[in-house]
Amino acid sequence: MTVSILLDSLKDDGQRLSECRHESPFSILGPQPFKDKWIIRIWMPEASQVELVTQQTKIKLQNPNHEWIFEGVLEKDPGTDYQIKVNRGGIEHVQHDPWSFRKEWMGEIDRHLFAEGNHHHIWRKMGAHLTEIDKKKGVMFCLWAPHAKSVSVIGDLNSWDGRHHPMQKRLGGIWELFIPGLSEGDLYKYEIRTEKGHCYEKADPYGFQHEVRPAKSSVISKIDSFQWSDQSWISNRDNRDPLEQPISVYEMHLGSWMHASSDDPFINSNGEHRAPVPAADMKPGSRLLTYKELANKVIPYVKERGFTHIELMPISEHPFDGSWGYQVTGWYAPTSRFGSPDEFRAFVDSCHKEGIGIILDWVPGHFPKDQHGLAYFDGSHLYEHSDPRVGEHKEWGTLIFNYSRNEVRNFLVANLIFWFDQFHIDGIRVDAVASMLYKDYLRPEGEWIPNEDGGNENFEAVRFLQQANHVLFQHFPGALSIAEESTTWTGVTKPTDMDGLGFNLKWNMGWMHDMLDYFEIDPWFRQFNQNNITFSICYNFTENFMLALSHDEVVHGKSHLLHKMPGDDWQKYANTRALLAYMWTHPGKKTIFMGMEFGQRQEWNVWDDLQWDLLNYEPHKGIQKLVDDLNNLYKREPALWRNDFDEYGFQWIDCDDNKNSVISFMRREKTDGEWLVIVANFTPQNHSNYRIGVPVDGFYEEIFNTDASQYGGSNLGNMGGKSTDLYNIHGYENSIDLCLPPLSVLVLKHKSKKN
């Protein structure tokens, strides 16, 4: 029997639903108790007929109150055990009723933790989740948009029409809806209607996959289904102090390391052909490599070079190639430019199999204004500050996260944990930390607001960074958290319980600037700038420093490393070799940008390949061989890394010979351990009898020489090493008389006697 129950309010409800203004569809749709029976109401825009089908009966539903609200009466609550047969435009289909699945997805504890900013795994609730409810497969959508008037799921399932699938608003500004029948790979967005009536289409902030640019939709994607094989790697990583290990990082941008021809087959991990992703309009005829192809090419290359880690410039989804990945719109998704999330997982897994760690650039300092992203998300400044003096980087054209809002901090902190949990990464480098710490960063007077103490420190950002690092090391004690922080802010690498920011490494920007300034000087004038090459040791042990020659130093007219060097080609190569060797022997972990390892000549261009053809020339092969051997020497000699952050690990022999631009020092492992002697000559002048003091007599084997012929040098040296003489110099009774080749660095190792 069909009974129509006329409620005056239903006309208004139907009108609000049809205009996407209803925040509580569960209050009228689905099974509703009425006296001793149950009314089933179905919202079905543009349907001409709807039938309710159960195991026992089939009922033709009526629409007496609104043309798109169909209803009928059952004796008992059917729960979710019914289907609806819909006729729309003469086409019939059968589906389950989304509004029959009424149980809350986000429980009270989840909401509480999220509201206080402490739900470290919030991505397991937010976003689009393939799941099963009452044995019915589908997708649960969950979104935080507290100021929205209504939210709908739109996609191919409803022809991108927001009237079809309005979501239910829960406590805490959470919106939920389970849609049966959706599957992996389906596209979706959220249509958000604001209190002012404006309508925005937004990608899912917690989406696990997004379309390839320039498309902007989110993609339903599985998590937790990948079969990892790196359990031993993860266990070893989390049970040792990463700072007590050699760390040599190859920074790279996946989209410009190498391209393939558009004509080359483009095959996914299942062996299926698919459409190639063009590199860019600026590189016609080329396509991006896939994660699988990159694994096959990058991993053997990096392993042969001897690097311990790969640092990937941001791979979180981003719409504009020219941002290099630093303007993120898809925080919980690796970019689809190179393949699927599981294909990126396979890339990381393959790296771990070969003993290579993965560090990701993470950008919690700002986000772009793209309409489908976080900006003005629910009609309010939800993720950003409303005042541009606090909430906008005008020079970058980006917005700044409101770190004072618990849910925003939660979004970011959980995102950090997400990458370690879901993709097994080993570390992060946080970009542009100084822009977060200072309220007046890149701002003229009058365009920033002082803190409550009248200063320029951003206390909210400080607390966020402390929370992020504290939570990270709680969950992943062997992780790396690296700060790109360009100022003298104190305590960047101090633990949070000592009021530090909690990072365990900081890029040494001062060292980088001093080194490049020094090496760009004509060698004959370096004698007047000796402080540049020695000053870093004065503050080296105030933080845990990483020495970095990054992508930022080879763009925007700065030229690549080789071309920064003065002199003719021979001197350019020799200077490059000397700088790299000094970097590898100086205290601190190491990072260089792709191309530096073989002497790239052109500036880095995000749309182009590296100049691989240069490896057809001996000087470039020599630089590559030098980097290989530096990495192997570095890993083989604990004196070069074990005491990077302990003053005992470094001691000058002589840093005052500015006339000859020569420095000498020792790297020491431990009190009774081995040490190395390093001597650097930063002029083209050969010194055939250069004496330095050494602490112990014996034989000093020359174990590395940047002037070796295999590196492209002149092959001057010390015939394998030198024995000490009883000659007092530099405060030592014993000394060795060395041949210092031009523009060279020597590494010598003490032995009790010559073999």
UniProtKB/Swiss-Prot annotation:
Q: Catalysed reaction(s)?
A: Transfers a segment of a (1->4)-alpha-D-glucan chain to a primary hydroxy group in a similar glucan chain
This protein's superkingdom? Bacteria
Q: Which Pfam families match?
A: Alpha-amylase (PF00128), Alpha-amylase_C (PF02806), CBM_48 (PF02922), GlgB_N (PF22019)
* Main enzyme class: transferase
The GO annotation for biological process reads: glycogen biosynthetic process
Q: Which UniProt keywords apply?
A: Carbohydrate metabolism, Glycogen biosynthesis, Glycogen metabolism, Glycosyltransferase, Transferase
Task: Enumerate the InterPro entries for this protein.
Answer: A-amylase/branching_C, Branching_enzy, GlgB, GlgB_N, GlgB_N_E_set_prok, Glyco_hydro_13_cat_dom, Glyco_hydro_13_N, Glyco_hydro_b
Q: Name one GO cellular component term.
A: cytosol
Q: Per its record, what are the GO molecular function terms?
A: 1,4-alpha-glucan branching enzyme activity; cation binding; hydrolase activity, hydrolyzing O-glycosyl compounds
Q: Could you confirm whether the keyword Nucleotide-binding appears in this record? A: no
In which pathway is this protein known to take part? Glycan biosynthesis; glycogen biosynthesis
- Location of the active site: D431 (nucleophile), E484 (proton donor)
Q: What is its EC number?
A: 2.4.1.18
Family per record: Belongs to the glycosyl hydrolase 13 family. GlgB subfamily.
**Role, per record:** Catalyzes the formation of the alpha-1,6-glucosidic linkages in glycogen by scission of a 1,4-alpha-linked oligosaccharide from growing alpha-1,4-glucan chains and the subsequent attachment of the oligosaccharide to the alpha-1,6 position.
PANTHER family xrefs: 1,4-ALPHA-GLUCAN-BRANCHING ENZYME
Q: How does it assemble?
A: Monomer.
Return the protein name.
1,4-alpha-glucan branching enzyme GlgB
Q: Which organism is it from?
A: Prochlorococcus marinus (strain NATL2A)
Encoding gene per record? glgB
